[in-house]
C-alpha cells in the first residue's frame, strides 16, 4: 500500500513539475477554447481586417529568435446593462525578452497593432484603430497539464495576477511575418467598420455563445480598461 502511495506522489510531482527558461516559451499557445490562434486565421494584414473566431479566447506565439505575436478576442461585460456587452479584438506583434529574474518584456511594433471595438447598443458600427501596448509578465511557468496531458503555460501579469492558462497548439509557432507589416505611410487610420470585420464581427452572436454572466468576462473588464490606454488613434 505504501509503495502505491509513494508511486502516486512521484507521478504527481512529474506531472506538475514546471520550468521557466526562454526555450520553453517557443510555440503557439492558446486558451482552452482553442479557437483563437495567432497567424493568418485571426488577422489579415493584406486586407487589414480581423477574422472572427468561433469562440472567444487569447493566444500568444513566441519564436526561438525573440519574436512574439498575440491575439485577443473577448466579450466585455457591461455592469450597467448586462444585456449590452462590448466586444474587442486585438492583435499585435514584436519582440520579447526573458529577463534574468524570470520576467518577460514584450515590445510591439507600434504601427502594426490593431484593435476593433464593438459597442452594438451605442452604434451599429465598430471602431477600428491602431493599437500599441507594451507588456510585462512578472513570471511564467511551463508544465505538463495533469488533466489534458499537454504542455501548459501559466503567466502572471505585471501586478502578479494570473492570466488564463494557455496550452501548446503549435511548435514551431504559427505566426505572421515578423517584420513591419503596415508602415505608417500606407496604413489606414481610425475608421468605422460596418458590421465589424466585413460583416463577421457579431457581438450579439458572441453573447449567445459565451454568456455574459460568465465570471471570465468580468475578469477581462479590468484588463480591457488597462489596455485601452494603449490605443493610438491616428488621422483618417
From Swiss-Prot:
Pfam families: Rot1 (PF10681). The chain crosses the membrane at residues 218-234. It is a single-pass type I membrane protein. Residues 1-22 form the signal peptide. Residues 23-217 are lumenal. GO terms for cellular component: endoplasmic reticulum membrane. Residues 235-236 are cytoplasmic. Glycans are attached at residues 54, 132. GO terms for molecular function: unfolded protein binding. Keywords: Endoplasmic reticulum, Glycoprotein, Membrane, Signal, Transmembrane, Transmembrane helix. Residues 178-197 are annotated as: Disordered. One of its GO terms (biological process) is 'de novo' protein folding. Residues 178-187 have a biased composition (Polar residues). Its main location: endoplasmic reticulum. It is found in: Endoplasmic reticulum membrane. PANTHER family: PROTEIN ROT1. Belongs to the ROT1 family. Required for normal levels of the cell wall 1,6-beta-glucan. Involved in a protein folding machinery chaperoning proteins acting in various physiological processes including cell wall synthesis and lysis of autophagic bodies. This is Protein rot1. The lineage of its organism: Eukaryota, Fungi, Dikarya, Ascomycota, Pezizomycotina.
Amino acid at each position: 500500500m505504501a509503495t502505491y502511495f509513494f508511486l502516486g506522489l512521484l507521478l504527481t510531482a512529474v506531472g506538475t513539475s514546471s520550468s521557466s527558461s526562454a526555450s520553453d516559451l517557443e510555440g503557439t499557445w492558446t486558451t482552452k477554447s482553442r479557437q483563437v490562434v495567432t497567424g493568418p486565421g485571426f488577422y489579415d494584414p493584406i486586407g487589414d481586417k480581423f477574422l472572427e473566431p468561433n469562440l472567444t479566447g487569447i493566444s500568444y506565439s513566441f519564436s526561438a529568435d525573440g519574436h512574439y505575436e498575440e491575439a485577443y478576442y473577448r466579450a466585455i461585460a457591461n455592469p450597467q446593462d448586462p444585456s449590452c456587452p462590448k466586444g474587442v479584438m486585438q492583435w499585435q506583434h514584436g519582440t520579447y525578452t526573458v529577463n534574468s529574474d524570470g520576467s518577460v518584456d514584450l515590445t510591439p511594433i507600434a504601427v502594426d497593432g490593431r484593435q476593433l471595438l464593438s459597442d452594438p447598443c451605442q452604434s451599429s458600427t465598430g471602431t477600428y484603430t491602431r493599437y500599441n501596448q507594451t507588456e510585462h509578465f512578472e513570471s511564467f511557468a511551463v508544465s505538463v497539464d495533469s488533466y489534458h496531458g499537454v504542455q501548459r503555460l501559466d503567466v502572471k501579469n505585471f501586478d502578479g495576477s494570473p492570466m488564463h492558462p494557455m496550452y501548446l497548439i503549435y511548435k514551431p509557432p504559427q505566426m505572421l511575418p515578423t517584420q513591419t507589416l503596415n508602415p505608417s505611410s500606407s496604413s489606414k487610420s481610425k475608421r468605422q467598420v460596418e458590421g465589424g470585420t466585413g460583416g463577421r464581427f457579431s457581438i450579439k452572436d458572441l453573447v449567445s455563445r459565451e454568456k455574459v454572466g460568465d465570471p471570465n468576462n468580468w475578469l477581462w473588464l479590468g484588463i480591457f480598461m488597462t489596455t485601452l490606454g494603449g490605443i493610438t488613434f491616428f488621422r483618417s
